Amino acid sequence: MTSASFAFSPRVLDPLDPQVRPDPQGRFGPFGGRFVPETLMSALTELEEAFEHHWRDPDFRAEFHNLLRDFVGRPSPLYFAQRLTEYYGGPQIYLKREDLNHTGAHKINNALGQVLLAVRMGKRRIIAETGAGQHGVATATVCARFGLECVIYMGALDMERQAPNVQRMRLLGAEVRGVESGTRTLKDALSEAIRDWVTNVETTHYVIGTVAGPHPYPKLVRAFHDVIGQETRQQCQEKWGGLPDVLLACVGGGSNALGLFNEFVRDPQVRLIGIEAAGEGLHTPRHAATLNRGRIGVLHGAMSYLLQDEEGQVQEAHSISAGLDYPGVGPEHSYLKEIGRAEYYAVTDDEAVEALLLLSRLEGIIPALETAHALAYLKTLAPQQGLRPANAIGPQQRVVVNCSGRGDKDLNTVFKYLQQRGRSF
């Protein structure tokens, strides 16, 4: 891993700029690229060529969208959160209900797309990494649907935090391999999955679960999640005949956020806001706020912002949310930050838990802890109690929050967290 600094010239985002898409080398400005061992270069080239070919194939697209409808249950609703809106006194808050997808999160969009691609490529063995377990469950689910061998790598600490999802993966026929090295979390699971892929590249497809990793993964994962934003645009037109004012999503690696944002990048009047995990606070080393506190370097095959020390070594990330507990971020998020098209802030563990409790009690929806980070930022955006920070928005503006997953998997974590602080549900 290396670190570097770059000089950026201010510019307006050009939707025709090939760097945005990304460019042929897989770069978003200086970010992205392909920093991998020579043994993986041919596999990545094969994957890129297969994706470009099949994504243009009407039969592939039709099969993908039919399965999104009939197997995943799309489109997911755009729900007006009336009581949450009343609580904050405005803005008008809508939830994009990815938690209602089959398996309970946005992750299945990408898992389905990649496994379909792997089948077309003749791969019969699928591997994946997972943090919160939702990507692992989604991948295991799709592998069961297509009768493929499935191996999931998961940090041992995350297996403890997300035991229900470990059970689901095994029930679906996947082999779950615990990773004891390093911090025993998502970063280490991803590293182990890459090692497996290097060894078994001829027979195996690696389903990366976020918009990180070497090219073409950031591009293809975004493509499979684009359905989130495409549906949102249509639903906004149907509900009020216009665009949302703000899109709000949590950011770990950043796939759910880009799935929502990408459709609206060319609409400058729509604010794009990503929320990272501040953990125990940005003033402490225990956070996962890569875009807020990181520096540029290379991790897991791509250049992006990373949490790293002065020697360029990757630092340990912390979040109560296993899905945000990652010291890197997708390279396109780094690019959107640098050109000023998207804003990135962070909320703490405490704030996320309070947001989870609030939505549960006001709307009858238990969100994932990942989603709760985005929901927590509504307190800053909303003019509640006369507080109007500089980036607050008006009471008639419309905010769409990506409800990226449901919170069943997090109940034990939240209950333990509250108990340690002398509280209960």
Curated annotation (Swiss-Prot):
GO terms for cellular component: cytoplasm. Disulfide bonds: none annotated. It comes from the Bacteria. The modification N6-(pyridoxal phosphate)lysine is found at residue 107. Tetramer of two alpha and two beta chains. GO terms for molecular function: tryptophan synthase activity. It catalyses: (1S,2R)-1-C-(indol-3-yl)glycerol 3-phosphate + L-serine = D-glyceraldehyde 3-phosphate + L-tryptophan + H2O. This is Tryptophan synthase beta chain. The beta subunit is responsible for the synthesis of L-tryptophan from indole and L-serine. It is an enzyme of class 4 (lyase). Its cofactor is pyridoxal 5'-phosphate. The gene is trpB.
